[in-house]
Amino acid sequence: NYVTLTNMSDADVERIITYRLEPVNISFQTMNPELRCRMLQNRFAGDALKKAQRFYEAGIVMNGQIVLCKGINDSAELESSIEKLSRYLPYLQSVSVVPVGLTEHREGLYPLEPFTREDAQKVLEQIHRWQDRLYREQGTHFIHAGDEWYLLAGQDRPKAENYDGYHDDRVMTRGIGLH
């Protein structure tokens, strides 16, 4: 399960650190505090990112997720988020990027657009570029695309070795690397 950290008190953070309750799975969405507030419709959502910094400083193992919304937290925003999240290595072990799930039951909700094949190809190019860079610099691919991106783009999914030696529940329960 992933948490946004918005409802987590400072006492909760200290308890996690004291008792080493890890890993903490965080739904980041974006590292832009203002955008995160808008996306989560919570005025404290941007401040919640400081809690992830606190976990990092305490050496708490984390995993992350970004639910990508077309035209909102993709492209340049995704680039910035990956760059900032990679600073949390090695304690932030991996980040999965998945497309927002859209259904026909969206009446009264913020209008979101589905990603196209071309969009998915661009997202994969961006993620693969970061994977190559981080593997060279840090020895980890770190950022992983949800299987939906490969299906939508019409591309084969990566081999198990691209999951940095842990092709297990840490990534598979997030829809990453299911073969």
Show which residues each predicted segment covers.
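Conserved Radical SAM active-site core
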Residues: 1-91, 102-130
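Auxiliary Fe-S-binding modules of radical SAM enzymes
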Residues: 86-88, 94-96, 100-179
